[in-house]
Curated annotation (Swiss-Prot):
Primary location: cytoplasm
Family listed: Belongs to the universal ribosomal protein uL5 family.
Subcellular location: Cytoplasm
Keywords: Cytoplasm, Ribonucleoprotein, Ribosomal protein, RNA-binding, rRNA-binding
Superkingdom of origin: Eukaryota
Self-association state and partner proteins as the record states: Component of the large ribosomal subunit (LSU). Mature N.crassa ribosomes consist of a small (40S) and a large (60S) subunit. The 40S small subunit contains 1 molecule of ribosomal RNA (18S rRNA) and at least 32 different proteins. The large 60S subunit contains 3 rRNA molecules (26S, 5.8S and 5S rRNA) and at least 42 different proteins.
The encoding gene: rpl-11
Organism: Neurospora crassa (strain ATCC 24698 / 74-OR23-1A / CBS 708.71 / DSM 1257 / FGSC 987)
Any one GO MF annotation of this record: RNA binding
Protein name: Large ribosomal subunit protein uL5
GO cellular component term, pick one: cytosolic large ribosomal subunit
GO biological process terms on file: translation
Function statement: Component of the ribosome, a large ribonucleoprotein complex responsible for the synthesis of proteins in the cell. The small ribosomal subunit (SSU) binds messenger RNAs (mRNAs) and translates the encoded message by selecting cognate aminoacyl-transfer RNA (tRNA) molecules. The large subunit (LSU) contains the ribosomal catalytic site termed the peptidyl transferase center (PTC), which catalyzes the formation of peptide bonds, thereby polymerizing the amino acids delivered by tRNAs into a polypeptide chain.
Amino acid sequence: MSTEQKAQNPMRELRIQKLVLNICVGESGDRLTRAAKVLEQLSGQTPVYSKARYTVRTFGIRRNEKISVHVTVRGPKAEEILERGLKVKEYELRKRNFSETGNFGFGISEHIDLGIKYDPGIGIYGMDFYCCMTRPGERVSRRRRAKSRVGATHRITRDDTVKWFKSRFDAIVR
């Protein structure tokens, strides 16, 4: 074992738990409905509307008014959409895009860069990508019966995700 490299523990492998796509329009109505169509075209799933938590008079937002849409994508579809989003960013993110718990996010300014055909009836929308990472065995902290904590050595850190991101996508982190 000393001459050959030690085998990696399969329980330590990082994987994508979910990818959340969010478009915040800042107002309810027709623009929000068109943004929902964009997310439905991209993900193939029905998006969910999010409400404002409190009134902001300067922006003209009232409490409980629907102001954004988001969709959660899991599995191979999440990896494929993330790949398309990173291609727009040219596989380059900043160190501050990665959280302390190992998740990362970024935004794009035009959805047509993802390969969706431009429709004048819909318009152009920017969107946020947020990717949550996980390891096998993390269910122990979420399950209902015999719940326990994930140990400190098994928790995902920013450095773990940056290393995974660089190797998986051959990307640059500034």
